Design a protein with these regions (language model features):
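Generic structural signal for well-ordered, non-transmembrane alpha-helical segments
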Residues: 53, 87, 124, 128-131, ...
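Extended intrinsically disordered or low-complexity regions, especially N/C-terminal cytosolic tails and loops
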Residues: 1-120, 186-187, 256
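Histidine-centered, metal-coordinating catalytic motifs and their short helical/loop contexts
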Residues: 180-208
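Flexible secondary-structure boundary motifs
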Residues: 119-185, 199
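Amphipathic, Lys/Arg-enriched alpha-helical patches that create a basic surface
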Residues: 207-256
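Short, charged/polar, low-complexity loop and linker segments
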Residues: 106-110, 167-177, 212-214
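Intrinsically disordered or highly flexible coil/loop and linker segments, enriched in small
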Residues: 146, 197, 201-205, 233, ...
């Protein structure tokens, strides 16, 4: 009887050890997958920074600001709306890249047309994907009990759809107030307004001239690439953040 008890105890100890080992391996495997995913998106971000000449120090600050949006958790409806908005931005990014690529391929021997397309592309990236990224972040801040005040309408904004209706300048001011300077400082508002209000003239040789001052406007492509790069980087971080929050929600639901 003593021998049997000793044998059963040994079997139990071995089973316990194997269970702990399997549990540890599973935990380590899960951790490895998470680290791989995080390293993958950071690697993508570093590649974009090198390609478009963006400081990775700025990107780390932007990443920290975006990840901080989940400090108090993210509600299910916020997660769903943000996920849909991110998909819209990704689609918009593809449209913008198609037009941006056209300026390099089809009209490179036509300087005036190329400059016109560059101006259109800049307006598209600011009013399209950049504005949408700003809106997603503004909404997530709003869901963390930070109020957006529209001084033009003299009212507080409470719904995601209402954010679309207010001026980009209001949303930029809101993000700037909450530390998103890397993003807010990337856009040239004067250039955007000059393009929208037709204050620029494009010469046959491709030079872009300010109609009022007569000065030449330069580096539009570089400014546009900088914004596009930060938008792409923001999307990578937002996707990672939303994925992590979705996993936490599923784990919480499974326990209840």
């Amino acid at each position: 009887m003593f021998a049997l008890n000793k044998y059963l105890t040994r079997i139990k100890n071995q089973a316990t050890w194997r269970y702990k080992r399997l549990k540890c391996n599973a935990r380590n495997s899960s951790l490895a997958v998470e680290m791989t995913r995080e390293l993958f998106y950071i690697k993508r971000q570093k590649f974009l920074c090198e390609k478009y000449g963006v400081s990775f120090d700025q990107v780390e600050k932007l990443n920290s600001d975006i990840i901080g949006l989940a400090n108090n958790g993210i509600k299910k409806n916020t997660l769903d709306l943000a996920r849909l908005a991110v998909k819209d931005v990704q689609q918009g990014m593809m449209y913008w890249l198609s037009i941006h690529g056209l300026t390099s391929r089809e009209v490179k021997e036509m300087p005036q047309e190329k400059s016109l397309l560059d101006l259109f592309s800049y307006l598209l990236v600011v009013e399209g994907i950049f504005s949408k990224v700003v809106q997603i972040i503004a909404f997530m801040l709003m869901e963390n009990d930070h109020d957006v005040f529209d001084s033009i309408r003299n009212e507080f904004i409470t719904e995601f759809e209402e954010l679309e209706k207010i001026d980009l300048a209001v949303k930029l001011k809101f993000l700037r107030k909450h530390g998103f300077l890397v993003l807010t400082d990337s856009v040239d508002r004067k250039l955007r307004n000059d393009i929208a209000h037709l204050n620029l003239a494009v010469k046959p040789d491709g030079k872009i001239i300010d109609k009022k001052s007569g000065t030449e406007i330069k580096n539009i492509v570089e400014k546009m690439d900088h914004i596009g790069c930060l938008c792409a980087i923001s999307l990578l971080t937002l996707n990672y953040l939303l994925d992590e929050q979705e996993k936490k929600m599923k784990l919480t639901d499974a326990k209840t």
